[in-house]
Curated annotation (Swiss-Prot):
Belongs to the IQD family. Disulfide bonds: none annotated. This is Protein IQ-DOMAIN 6. Residues 116-146 are annotated as: Calmodulin-binding. Residues 83-111, 112-134, 135-158 form the IQ domain. GO terms for biological process: cytokinesis, division site positioning. Binds to multiple calmodulin (CaM) in the presence of Ca(2+) and CaM-like proteins. InterPro entries: IQ_motif_EF-hand-BS. SMART domains: IQ. It is found in: Nucleus; Nucleus, Nuclear body; Cytoplasm, Cytoskeleton; Cell membrane. A motif (Nuclear localization signal) lies at residues 14-21. Keywords: Calmodulin-binding, Cell membrane, Cytoplasm, Cytoskeleton, Membrane, Nucleus, Repeat. Transmembrane segments: none annotated.
Length: 416
């Protein structure tokens, strides 16, 4: 920048010198000289040219101009021509130097401007790129939101969710990896055995609680205790009972046993003399109806009915019981009907519903034959036994017939 300033000052100084010379030439004291006029004309010829073209002035043109001046000049002015020629050469060299210096200054200015403008352009370009990136991001977010709202976007989201669930399942499987030795079947069998063992333990606990409750109830029932001691004294064989599992289950239902006890207590008449007692065939008979099957249970009267005096003791070994089952379909709900209650109900029946004498006789004969056959089969299949009776696998696990009739019991599973 300093060189350019000096160059401008030098140009201004040259212009001032030219103006002074022109003013002096127009004055009165002006003297005409050949070399001055020629130098002024040559200066005027060179002044109209551009400063940047001064370096390209051809030496031949300068030489031809000098030769023409010499030829026009007279011989006596040869010395002045030589001086003028030398001045032209000096001015030409000086002007070339100034032009080169100005060119260098211009080149520096151009370079500086290029640097400044380049930096500004780069800044502007960076800002523009940042703005474009921000716009692109905003557009991408808007498009992604639109895609999510469409059906296709929802399907893609479902696929992504399924993939995530699969990965979650794989993670769960990896977390729940089993390090046990053996095949899958062995592990499954072990787990199943554990479950079965837990189930059996629960059943055993339930059975123990039921037995405990049953023992507490049987301890307060004298009739039940006497019947239990009676059956244990007989010691029949476990597997020689002549009953089917259905008959035993029906005869030992606890929910019906309570009703039987209530019916017996309600229908039992006061103690009678020994001569007024009924025969064994006409003993108390209880009919049990369950699932359209009638079961008749006949037993000896209780001890207080057999005793003729307060001091009489009942012999448990002399007692006997028989059970007979008839498969006559019976409609209606499960209930208990005793002969005593039926005799009372007959009083309220109309005459056309009562049985005839022949029908009654047939029923008596059939009843006696059936009871005798049942007793014979029972005595034939009976034997000595110890402990409680166990059922077959097909029998109900909650019924046991080691206890007397009308006693709520449970069955145990068969051992080995």
């Amino acid at each position: 920048m300093g060189a350019s300033g000096k160059w401008v000052k030098s140009i201004i100084g040259l212009k001032k010198l030219e103006k002074d010379e022109i003013e002096k030439g127009n004055g009165k004291n002006k003297k005409w000289k050949l070399w001055r006029t020629t130098s002024v004309d040559s200066w005027k010829g060179f002044r109209g040219k551009h400063r940047s073209d001064s370096d390209g002035v051809d030496s031949s043109t300068v030489y031809s101009a000098a030769v023409a001046t010499v030829l026009r000049a007279p011989p006596k002015d040869f010395k002045a021509v030589r001086e003028e020629w030398a001045a032209i050469r000096i001015q030409t060299a000086f002007r070339g130097f100034l032009a080169r210096r100005a060119l260098r200054a211009l080149k520096g200015i151009v370079r500086l401007q290029a640097l400044v403008r380049g930096r500004q352009v780069r800044k502007q370009a960076a800002v523009t790129l940042r703005c474009m990136q921000a716009l692109v991001r905003v557009q991408a977010r808007v498009r992604a939101r639109r895609v999510r709202m469409t059906v296709e976007g929802q399907a893609v989201q479902k696929l992504l969710d399924e993939h995530r669930t699969k990965s979650d399942l794989l993670k769960e499987v990896e977390e729940g990896w089993c390090d046990r030795k053996g095949t899958v079947d062995d592990i499954k069998s072990k787990l199943q055995q554990r479950q079965e063992g837990a189930f059996k333990r629960e059943r055993a606990l339930a059975y123990a609680l039921a037995q405990k409750q049953w023992r507490s109830t049987t301890s307060s029932n004298l009739k039940t205790n006497s019947s239990i001691s009676y059956l244990k004294s007989q010691e029949f064989d476990k597997n020689s009972w002549g009953w089917s599992w259905l008959e035993r289950w029906m005869a030992a239902r606890p929910w019906e046993t309570r009703l039987m006890d209530t019916v017996d207590t309600a229908a039992t008449p006061p103690p009678l003399p020994h001569k007024h007692l009924k025969s064994p065939e006409t003993a108390d008979v209880v009919q049990v109806r369950r699932n359209n099957v009638t079961t008749r249970v006949s037993a000896k009267p209780p001890p207080h009915m057999l005793s003729s005096s307060p001091g009489y003791e009942f012999n448990e070994s002399s007692g006997s019981s028989s059970i007979c089952t008839s498969t006559t379909p019976v409609s209606g709900k499960t209930g208990l009907v005793s002969d005593n209650s039926s005799s009372q109900a007959k009083k309220h029946k109309p005459s056309y519903m009562s049985l005839t004498e022949s029908t009654k006789a047939k029923r008596r004969t059939n009843r006696g034959l059936r009871q005798s056959m049942d007793e014979f089969q029972f005595m034939k299949n009976s034997g000595m036994f110890t402990g409680e009776l166990k059922t077959s696998p097909s029998s109900d696990p909650f019924v046991s017939f080691s206890k007397p009739l009308g006693v709520p019991t449970r069955f145990e599973k068969p051992r080995g």
